[in-house]
Amino acid sequence: MQAEITWLDDPEVFRVNQLPAHSDHPFYADEEECRRGNSSLCHSLNGMWQFCYSKNAGERPADFYREDFDTAGFDEIRVPGHIELAGYDKIQYINVMYPWEGQDYRRPAGTPSAENQRADLFSGAVYNPVGSYRRVFDLPENMKGK
């Protein structure tokens, strides 16, 4: 399976691989766990993850999700966190122009102008940072089949 990024240029696409709406309320194996407030059915993925920063989608490691992918070129980053505060890219403040202002031509997706008929204004942009995160973990025995 090859990941496609051209959805970035289609104004009718507003989500890709998004889970359907669901409750994020905590749940417990039994009433006693609920009283203690510590669920045996929760496994935190917070911590250090493998991370690869790419300045645009064309440079991203497209197959990094595969089990046999070599992550030797990946760094480590703390999750949750912000890539900018971890030293990747530039911090974006609200009182400052966006980094692509004056660098890349950006019109709303799907609205090419007479001067610029490119269909890949976002997916083919020179500057459109992408972060690829990866973490391998073993599912605890008590969570299997749940």
Give residue ranges: language-model regions:
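Extended carbohydrate-recognition surfaces in non-catalytic/accessory domains of CAZymes
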Residues: 1-145
